[in-house]
């Protein structure tokens, strides 16, 4: 069986919230983006089954309280520099999700995604992100199992196969996001 060869600027592997958000940001930078998903985009990931709740400095929750809560929950082994970035950006990044069609309910120190239901509370996050990513030109490679990364010292692509028909695929990319 022949190998299908695809080239792109940015290959993103995984269609959970992180992969979708990364694909949207890369596309906003004007590059060609290919999002590879092992099933239909946005279906088989932890984000869709998440509770759809986030902590951030909203209402009476200050950034200092958010920082302390996060460090305590992490049993003091967190990378405090990364926690500072999280605390500084959490509220604005959560509000930014509304630009992509995500409906939010914001309370004191928390933010919940609406439009999800058990067992897929995170559907209210994932489905709008998939829709937005498609609308801005993110290309989707669905039902594709990525089995290996390409490159020696520097990753410049990946290989895998279509889970439905067995077709093999090789993807060349200037950047790869896992």
Segments and roles (model prediction):
Residues 25, 31, 38-162:
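Conserved N-terminal/central alpha/beta ligand/cofactor-binding core
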Residues 4-8, 164-175:
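Core beta-strand elements of the Rossmann-like FAD/NAD(P) dinucleotide-binding domain
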Residues 62-66, 171-178:
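Short coil-to-beta-strand
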Residues 1-10, 17, 139-141:
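N-terminal charge/polar-biased segments
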Residues 10, 17, 159, 171, ...:
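Mobile, glycine-rich extracellular loop/lid and propeptide segments
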